[in-house]
């Protein structure tokens, strides 16, 4: 959580009353100041959190909020009436109407996975790719794909920890 690229966003969410920073404080297992030896304009706090504890605390916070209804689904289409988004239709044909919609697309819009020389449509760990990009395109939005990469994982048993230093 935080870092050079996203630390300002965490601070903005905190300033607006969000719980991201509070949850990070409660579930953090390592806190560092990046670029501590450089000038103040390039310093940035970063925290590593216990992933499961962070998820459970955020889930509890959201589920405890009386004015929030939580639906987990793959949004297939945006419902538009008179140039206003009034809801969404899910891939299971469930219609959810709302006065406002926050679209958090993540990385699954037209998701394409590359494994070696093979390419296939999809998201992480077998999840389906999102089709909401087709709905956005039909509404006149320019939708692009951005390539992200996940490096190979290292087997912890192959590391000689005697040659590392504690941070």
Model regions and ranges:
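Catalytic cores of nucleotide-enabled group-transfer and carboxylate-activating enzymes in metabolic
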Residues: 80-83
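Conserved N-terminal/central alpha/beta ligand/cofactor-binding core
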Residues: 1-77, 92, 104-122, 127-133, ...
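Local beta-strand N-terminus motif with an aromatic residue
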Residues: 68, 85, 98-99
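Core beta-strand elements of the Rossmann-like FAD/NAD(P) dinucleotide-binding domain
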Residues: 89-100
């Amino acid at each position: 959580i935080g870092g050079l690229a996203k630390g300002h966003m965490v601070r903005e969410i905190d300033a607006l009353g969000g719980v991201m920073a509070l949850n990070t404080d409660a579930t953090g297992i390592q806190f560092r100041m990046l670029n501590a030896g450089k000038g103040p304009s390039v310093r940035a706090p970063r925290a590593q959190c216990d992933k499961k504890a962070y998820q459970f605390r955020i889930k509890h916070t959201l589920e405890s909020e009386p004015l929030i209804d939580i639906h987990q689904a793959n949004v297939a289409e945006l419902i538009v009436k008179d140039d206003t988004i009034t809801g969404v239709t899910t891939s299971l044909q469930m219609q959810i109407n709302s006065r406002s919609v926050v679209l958090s697309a993540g990385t699954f819009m037209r998701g394409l996975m590359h494994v070696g020389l093979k390419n296939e449509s999809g998201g992480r760990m077998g999840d389906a790719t999102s089709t909401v990009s087709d709905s956005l395109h039909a509404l006149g939005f320019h939708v692009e794909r951005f390539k992200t990469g996940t490096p190979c994982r290292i087997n912890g048993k192959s590391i000689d920890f005697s040659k590392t230093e504690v941070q």
